[in-house]
Amino acid sequence: MQAVNIIRWIDGPVLVGDSPGSKPPSERLQDTMAVSDPPVEAAGEASATRSGFWALTLGSIGVVFGDIGTSPLYAFREAVSHAAQQGTVTPVIVLGVLSLILWSLFIVVTAKYVLLLLRADNNGEGGTLSLMALGQRALGRQSLLLLALGVVGASMFIGDSMITPAISVLSAVEGLKLAAPEFGNYVVPLTLLILVMLFAVQSRGTASVASAFAPVMALWFVAIAVLGALHIHEDPSVLLAVNPWYAIHFLLNHGLIGLVIMGLVFLSVTGGEALYADLGHFGRKPIQAAWFCLVLPALLLNYFGQGALILAHPDAIENPFYRLAPAPMILPLVILATAATVIASQAVITGAYSLIRQAVQLGLLPRFEVRYTSETHAGQIYLPRVNILLLIGVLLLVLLFRTSSGLASAYGIAVSTTMVADGIMGFVVVWKLWNWRAATAAALVVPLVVVDIMFFSANLLKLLDGAWVPLLFGLIMVVLIWTWRRGAAILIKKTRRTEVPLLDLIKSLEKRPPHIVKGTAVFLTSDPNFVPTALLHNLKHNKVLHEHNVILTIETAQTPRVDPSERVRMENISEKFSTVSLRFGFMESPNVPKALVIARKLGWQFDIMATSFFVSRRSLKASAQSGMPVWQDRLFIAMSRSANDAINYFQIPTGRVVEVGTQVII
């Protein structure tokens, strides 16, 4: 096995290189679709039947496209209304904004994500952290630049996961003001109620309603397509916006305002990053089919329909999306829009859970408590602390901005940051992993990254108008990850000074053996070359040694999943000592007892009822010479104390565990 530099956890796993011979497990259908997991090849298309392929395609419509699919509620309105602030709505403004939206969807979403990055799968999986791990593997070493890009991109996704539910649900509920103006004062309270209910049901899982996600979202896309198509005839000149010159002309003639409008046009592509993040759930071809066959045409028809409506009726700028519908249909459309935004929010929340779990597995964050909400789908998880923090953030955003127009100013900066990070890491993959010439890779990827940077710059102009909020959330995540990694590295360095090499201890015990007791003792450690703290304390205080002693290390590979045949590595180092290494992918939940069943098949006579697991629990105290500022020392210690203990995280039976407490000064 070719290893890369390692990242160690406190009493936890190690990040290791993947085995060249490892094989990806079968692809699984998105967990939120309440159907069984079909076996599919890598990204899930080759072995799927035609019906299975279209089931995956329909499933992706219900999960992948919720965010970008609800953008017509506010994106076009915000861009045109800001462009027309100095006067009336003109054809130049409408055609310019429409052209910008159309070509943004073509370049950012279609070219970059649908056609390029969906091919950059990490054993079938996608997402910012998966792309980071893929880039590290392509380079064959740890890269601080890639690590920084992955951390920043993932952190900004968390910031975005707070604002997406807020703006989506709020923009949907605002339709009530058209259906029944007297309900205008109840928009914010109703939005808060819906969001609280959404987060409250997370602990129960979504399996019972997940099967309805795809049909509802499919109905949503059909509805917005029909509504848009019915109005294009009011001013067919909007079709001229297909010509990119209208976008270029608009930017050239509007100066700084044009750049501000670009930041609002970007709202039409937010959610594009979800296409890559959900690659592992559905596969490349089903996502591409859903995009080209339904989602993209529906979005374009709706945006062009809004444009034609505004040219024919300039007063419709107040809420052009809902004005597309006849008066009797506004209330049903509000209900459908609310359902669509709740589904979009659910997908973002689930994505945040998954991303946090990946970060924990990669050693970027402390262990969070993970609860499983489904007996049949391992991907349906619930993180209580993360759920509470997300809910607080979402409610604060609604109370702070109170309208979707206000939130629109805050939206985009986090997503654009993630997209820039994805683009740069994508270049590394195209260049190093796909073995393209640097010039060819640059010719393909650099123009896409330049567009991302333009959108990022445009969103920076909204910093004082509210964009600082998601940026602040993202920066807090960056600080937490930086503190955890830095503190863990310092802790490992300090504890290494006092650790005893395992082979030296074994030789010493052979010369002067202690009292031997029956049974097997398993000692968890992050480095099998040194004596676990729990073993030293057992010898020091209990003065006994078990018949069989297993030094157990849990490692996290740079691949999403590890094939069961690659799960366990065993080595006998003496008559009484052996080492066992368990490898898990960064998208898997470590289950030690299940993994040890594989060890039994390899010849280890393992009886869990005659086995004791020894785990050390460290109590940290700060020192003036830690190498970190005092505030960071305290933050690291607080994060360490809040971490879920190894017993629960690795699903070890509590009745077979012996905990040994130690105090460490960092």
From Swiss-Prot:
Membrane-crossing residue ranges in chain numbering: 53-73, 89-109, 144-164, 181-201, 212-232, 247-267, 291-311, 324-344, 381-401, 411-431, 441-461, 463-483
Protein name: Probable potassium transport system protein Kup
GO cellular component: plasma membrane
Reaction catalyzed: K(+)(in) + H(+)(in) = K(+)(out) + H(+)(out)
Membrane is among the record's keywords: yes
Gene: kup
Membrane topology note: Multi-pass membrane protein
Family from the record: Belongs to the HAK/KUP transporter (TC 2.A.72) family.
Stored PANTHER family: LOW AFFINITY POTASSIUM TRANSPORT SYSTEM PROTEIN KUP, OSMOTIC STRESS POTASSIUM TRANSPORTER
Superkingdom of origin organism: Bacteria
Main location: membrane
Keywords: Cell inner membrane, Cell membrane, Ion transport, Membrane, Potassium, Potassium transport, Symport, Transmembrane, Transmembrane helix, Transport
Organism in which the protein naturally occurs: Nitrobacter hamburgensis (strain DSM 10229 / NCIMB 13809 / X14)
InterPro entries reported for this sequence: K+_transporter, K_trans_C, K_trans_N, Kup
Cell location: Cell inner membrane
Presence of keyword Thylakoid: no
Any GO molecular function: potassium ion transmembrane transporter activity
Role of this protein: Transport of potassium into the cell. Likely operates as a K(+):H(+) symporter.
Pfam families from the UniProt entry: K_trans, K_trans_C
